[in-house]
């Protein structure tokens, strides 16, 4: 008979951070942890088909199994291409 595990689910915005602790059955998935956290109801901007997720900063799939003490993170979409931003900074530095 599987036991219980405690997992944190985190979602951070520039102005506010959400951190929900949930208790799940052993063998629960990342998606189950997110749904149990209630963040999908609190934040309608979270779309699990678009937002990437991770466990302690390591990319994860919604189907990955979570373990006791894990922190599941929901990442916001990038608003700018990092390569493009680096290119622009390099051009700006070269023009000085």
UniProtKB/Swiss-Prot annotation:
InterPro entries for the chain: Mopterin_synth/thiamin_S_b (IPR016155), RnfH (IPR005346), RnfH_sf (IPR037021)
One Pfam entry name: Ub-RnfH
Domain of life: Bacteria
NCBIfam families assigned: PRK01777.1
Family: Belongs to the UPF0125 (RnfH) family.
HAMAP family named among the record's database cross-references: UPF0125_RnfH (MF_00460)
PANTHER family: UPF0125 PROTEIN RATB
The protein's name: Protein RnfH
Species per Swiss-Prot/TrEMBL record: Escherichia coli O81 (strain ED1a)
Higher taxonomy: Bacteria, Pseudomonadati, Pseudomonadota, Gammaproteobacteria, Enterobacterales
